[in-house]
Regions:
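HIT superfamily nucleotide-processing domains
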Residues: 1-171
Length: 171
């Protein structure tokens, strides 16, 4: 996206303080940080919706956030962390998935506040059931696709030596 600051950082059309970069993601120090050492991680591709982010990039983003946090804790001696994932229409100026890691210090005067409300227990129960059932379906679909891939792998290697090795791995 032409007007997205995160895309401009990823494309190196504006300067930044890059902490980590690979083919998929980039991690930079926040130039307008809420606290010392705050940093941002985001995909290089313009992806707006977290639910469309592939698992590999998602895992990379959170893994890098952890390791950079470890390094920063050794340097800055912070007392805690807040990690904020922004996606889609969440009040941000640019609709580009970002993870913002904010080191926290005693008396840093940062306030994170949510307007909370008492949720209806029947809705919570309904939502819990829906989510757990969907997770079971996802898990079954994954296992079925994995079994299908194994069967295709067996068909490719008809030679008995390979077949024997395949059985040995699973015994």
């Amino acid at each position: 996206m032409d007007d997205c600051v995160y895309c401009k950082i990823a494309n190196k059309t504006i300067p930044s303080y890059i902490l980590y970069e690979d083919n998929d993601i980039i991690c930079v120090l926040d130039i307008l940080p809420p606290s010392k050492g705050s940093f941002l991680i985001f995909p290089k591709l313009h992806i707006e919706d977290y639910t469309s982010l592939n698992d590999e990039i998602n895992q990379k983003m959170f893994t890098i956030s952890k390791y950079i946090s470890i390094i920063l804790k050794n340097k800055l001696k912070f007392d805690g962390l807040n990690i904020l994932l922004s996606s889609g229409e969440t009040g941000q100026k640019y609709k580009h998935i970002t993870i913002q890691v904010i080191p926290r210090f005693k008396d840093d005067n940062i306030k994170i506040y949510f307007n909370r409300f008492k949720e209806d227990p029947s809705f919570l129960e309904e939502l819990k059931n829906y989510i757990t059932n969907e997770l079971i379906k996802m898990s079954q679909n994954y296992l079925n696709s994995e079994k299908k891939e194994e069967k295709e792998e067996i068909k490719k290697d008809v030679d008995y030596k390979s077949l024997n090795q395949w059985f040995e791995k699973r015994i």
